[in-house]
UniProtKB/Swiss-Prot annotation:
Keywords: Chemotaxis, Cytoplasm, Hydrolase, Phosphoprotein. The gene is cheB2. CDD domains: CheB_Rec, REC_CheB-like. PROSITE patterns: CHEB, RESPONSE_REGULATORY. This is Protein-glutamate methylesterase/protein-glutamine glutaminase 2.
Length: 351
């Protein structure tokens, strides 16, 4: 049975383009196109779509207000269509916190290749959203972390260990929830979240405001410090290297790996090579298989591996593949994942 899709956008051009893209795929059924939230509400009640593509910036009632009302009245998988601006990125992360499954930038239609790539991406995201588990918005997602007692890590652990995190669909909120479970003093943390250029800096800023330690977008050649987390820039692979006993960030715009740039596999393979048994890797919610090869390599090099449990995943794709390969030591639901990881780190390199 085809996936029923509703397009909500105040732009006639964008509605027309998205409509044609959706109609080109036999697995999808375009049930309606709405120019504003009032039309959208009627169409949601009439057609009961499986997935909604929703513009953030709309007249009368904006996309965020409509999304908030929708998730309370009739939870539906929503893919946000976002402007490539700082304000647009900010609103996008607010939408994800409210329960949107995923987002995609507005289409750039300056070349046939760009059009085709965008069509492939939006169709993939709609199909992924249709399979997603709708989780309740985390009540604490937009509030700073509260102090609580955490196991203290030895100075040696903080200076020698490295934590690597990979995620895709549903990952922005999962990463925030995980980082909020960590104390201020941690080994360096490196993060790859599938995300286009123009959004990762805002994502890092949001994590920085809401967690106990410093979070920033990774820069080429910078030393990876304890008490810092580093986010892979959109459209660039993040790797780690080791120079003179210190971990450093390496960025590149190489080919997509496992269908993505940044790729979790690229990060994890570098972590396996340079951190080895001093690595702790976590694979979170996401569609597809990115990260499974890399976390298997970390396991083979003696690192510790964790996967998010199915119940708390928006999409149990990436963790499932890694578990299937026998590469995961601990499968833990998100609310307990941080504490489990901390227990492990507290047990190594005791002074």
């Amino acid at each position: 049975m085809a996936i029923k899709v509703l397009v909500v956008d105040d732009s006639t051009l964008i509605r027309s383009l998205l409509g044609k893209m959706i109609e080109s795929d036999p697995e999808l059924s375009l049930v309606g196109m709405a120019a504003d939230a009032y039309m959208a509400k009627d169409m949601v009640n009439q057609f009961r779509p499986d997935v909604i593509t929703l513009d953030i910036e709309m007249p009368k009632v904006d996309g965020l207000t409509f999304l908030d009302r929708l998730m309370k009245a009739r939870p539906t998988a929503v893919v946000m269509i976002s402007a490539l601006t700082e304000e647009g990125a900010d609103a996008t992360f607010n939408a994800l916190a409210l329960g949107a499954v995923d987002f995609i930038p507005k289409p750039k239609l300056d070349s046939p290749q760009g059009f085709n790539e965008y069509q492939d991406l939006i169709l993939e995201k709609i199909k992924s959203a249709a399979k997603a588990k709708l989780l309740k918005a985390l009540p604490s997602a937009s509030t700073p972390v509260k102090s609580s007692i955490k196991p203290a890590l030895s100075q040696r652990t903080v200076n020698t260990q490295l934590v690597a995190i990979g995620a895709s669909t549903g990952g922005t909120e999962a990463i925030l929830a995980l980082l909020k479970q960590f104390p201020a003093v941690m080994p360096p943390i490196v993060i790859t979240q599938h995300m286009p250029a123009g959004f990762t800096c805002t994502f890092a800023d949001r994590l920085n405001k809401l967690t106990r330690f410093n979070v920033k977008q990774a820069e080429e050649g910078e030393r990876l410090l304890p008490c810092y987390a580093y986010v892979a820039p959109g459209d660039q692979h993040l790797e780690i290297i080791k120079v003179g006993g210190s971990f450093k960030a390496k960025l590149s715009q190489g080919d997509k790996v496992s269908g993505h740039r940044p790729s979790v596999d690229v990060l994890f393979h570098s972590v396996a090579q340079y951190a080895g048994e001093n690595a702790t890797a976590v694979i979170l919610t996401g569609m597809g298989k990115d990260g499974a090869d890399g976390i298997e390599a970390i396991d083979m090099q003696g690192g510790k591996t964790f996967a998010q449990g199915e119940q708390s995943c928006v999409v149990f794709g990436m963790p499932k593949e890694a578990i299937k390969r026998g590469a995961i030591h601990h499968v833990v639901e998100l609310p307990q994942l941080g504490d489990k990881l901390l227990q492990y780190l507290a047990s190594v390199n005791r002074d």
